[in-house]
């Protein structure tokens, strides 16, 4: 199964991805993890990404896409994957589509975890991270909405919307049910 995971910060994508990865026996591929791994290993792509991150800039789409492509070419991703953090834009969605076409496959679906803003704020404040204050969280949510709304429209009928409120187990059951698992 080849899936993209969407949802605002604090929606529980990482938590659900870990459970789904184990249950579906497919890798969870997070762009954040890819950046950290490539930078940590000192790969050419990692060095390129680090130069942008160190300058406080976003890593360009082409660098991120090359990291994703390299990761998708590994053996464990042949049977499927959960992609988290890419695509973030319609342009990236088109790049992913072409990339997968080159592998002779396509996405099986796009899971969009929906959660009320107040629930996200509450969850993120409860994590106790230094950079998580209410104003910062609400700003991040607005940026997410602005970036992702066109992507959700782009995927249209391929979107599988999951209400990401309630227990971790309930959310996982809803996700697996929507996937027919």
Swiss-Prot record:
InterPro entries: Adenylat/UMP-CMP_kin, Adenylat_kinase_CS, P-loop_NTPase
Location of region: NMP: 30-59
Keyword terms of this UniProt record: ATP-binding, Cytoplasm, Kinase, Nucleotide biosynthesis, Nucleotide-binding, Transferase
Binding-site list for AMP: 31, 36, 57-59, 85-88, 92, 129, 140
GO cellular component: cytoplasm
Domain of life: Bacteria
Pathway connected to this protein: Purine metabolism; AMP biosynthesis via salvage pathway; AMP from ADP: step 1/1
Localization (cell): Cytoplasm
Cross-referenced Pfam families: ADK
Residues annotated as binding ATP: 10-15, 127, 166
EC number: 2.7.4.3
Entries under PANTHER family matching the protein: NUCLEOTIDE KINASE (PTHR23359)
Domain remark text: Consists of three domains, a large central CORE domain and two small peripheral domains, NMPbind and LID, which undergo movements during catalysis. The LID domain closes over the site of phosphoryl transfer upon ATP binding. Assembling and dissambling the active center during each catalytic cycle provides an effective means to prevent ATP hydrolysis.
Role: Catalyzes the reversible transfer of the terminal phosphate group between ATP and AMP. Plays an important role in cellular energy homeostasis and in adenine nucleotide metabolism.
Family: Belongs to the adenylate kinase family.
UniProt protein name: Adenylate kinase
Organism: Corynebacterium diphtheriae (strain ATCC 700971 / NCTC 13129 / Biotype gravis)
Gene name of the record: adk
């Amino acid at each position: 199964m080849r899936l993209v995971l969407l949802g605002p910060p604090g929606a529980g994508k990482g938590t659900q991805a870990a459970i789904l990865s184990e249950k579906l026996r497919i890798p969870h591929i997070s762009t954040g993890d890819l950046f950290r791994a490539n930078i940590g290993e000192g790969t050419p792509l990692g060095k390129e990404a680090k130069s942008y991150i160190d300058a406080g800039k976003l890593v360009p789409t082409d660098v991120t896409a090359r990291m994703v492509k390299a990761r998708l070419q590994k053996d464990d991703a042949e049977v499927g994957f959960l992609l988290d953090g890419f695509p973030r834009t319609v342009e990236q969605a088109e790049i992913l589509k072409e990339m997968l076409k080159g592998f002779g496959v396509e996405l099986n679906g796009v899971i969009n975890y929906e959660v009320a803003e107040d629930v996200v704020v509450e969850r993120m404040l409860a994590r106790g991270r230094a950079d998580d204050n209410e104003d910062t969280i609400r700003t991040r949510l607005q940026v997410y909405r602005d970036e992702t709304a066109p992507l959700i429209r782009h995927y249209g009928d391929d979107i599988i919307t999951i209400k990401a409120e309630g227990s971790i187990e309930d959310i996982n059951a809803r996700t697996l049910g929507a996937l027919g698992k």
